[in-house]
Amino acid sequence: MHNFNNPNELPKEMLYFTYDEFQKFLSVEKDIKFRCAWQLLYYCGLRIGELKGITWKDIDFENRTVSINKQITQQSCRSRWSFSPPKTAKSNRVLPLTKVLLNDLKLLKESDSKILFGFNDTYFVIGDIAPQISSTITAKKNRNCELAGVKQIRIHDFRHSCASLLIYKGANINTVSKFLGHTKIEETLNTYTHLYKNALTDITALIDDMNNEQKSNF
C-alpha cells in the first residue's frame, strides 16, 4: 500500500526527455543561466534543492566537476531561504560535467562577475547573492516546453531523464545509484526497473538484427 500525504492523491506518472527531446528543449533557451540550469538537471540528475544550492565554489573548472554538498529548503521568496544537508549521506557526491556545460558555466561566471555587485564564489550559480525560487524555474520550464514543442515534464523528471540516459548508454545499476545519490541500490532498482527491461529488449533486438545480417551474408 502506498503512503501518500493526501489519501486522494494518485502517484504521478514518471516522464522523461529523450536526448533528442532535451536538445530541442535546450535549443529555445537563450538565457545562459537557465541553459546551465537545464543541463545541470539533465546531465547530473539533480534534485531541485541541490540545483539551487550550488555556489561557484562548488564548480571545479580544472577537474570538470560539480560538488553536491547542500540543498536549499524553506524558500518562499528570494529573500527567505536556508541551507540544509543533502537528502541523504549518499547524496553528497562529486559529478562530472560535460564539455558543453563546462563552457556555458565559464561564460556564465564571466558574465555574473561583471554585472553582479560584490560577486564572489559564495554566489549561487542559479541565482545571484540568493538562490532562484522554484516557481520561476518551473514557469521557465513550462514556457520552453511550449516553444520547443516537446511534452511537459516536471522539474523532478529531469532527474528521471538523467537516469534514462545513463541506463540506455549502458551504465550499470551501481553507477546509476551513485550518480543519483541514492542510499541503496534497491531504491534505484525499484524506481527504474522498467527502464532496464526496455534497455535489455533493445539490446536483444540489436543482436537479432546482427544475426539476420550475418545469415544474409551466407
What role is predicted for each listed range?
Residues 155-156, 192:
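Catalytic tyrosine of NAD(P)H-dependent dehydrogenase/reductases that use a Tyr as the general acid/base
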Residues 1-54, 62, 91-92, 159:
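Basic, Lys/Arg- and aromatic-enriched nucleic-acid-binding interface segment
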Residues 58-65, 171-191:
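Short, polar N-cap/turn motifs at the start of nucleic acid-interacting alpha helices
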Residues 39, 43, 49-50, 136, ...:
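C-terminal catalytic core of tyrosine-transesterase DNA break-rejoin enzymes
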Residues 7-8, 16, 72, 180-205:
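Catalytic-site neighborhood detector that most strongly recognizes the C-terminal catalytic loop/helix
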Residues 19-20, 98-151:
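Active-site/catalytic core of tyrosine-dependent DNA strand-transfer enzymes
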Residues 63, 74-76, 81-92, 99-101, ...:
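C-terminal secondary-structure termini that scaffold catalytic or DNA-interacting sites
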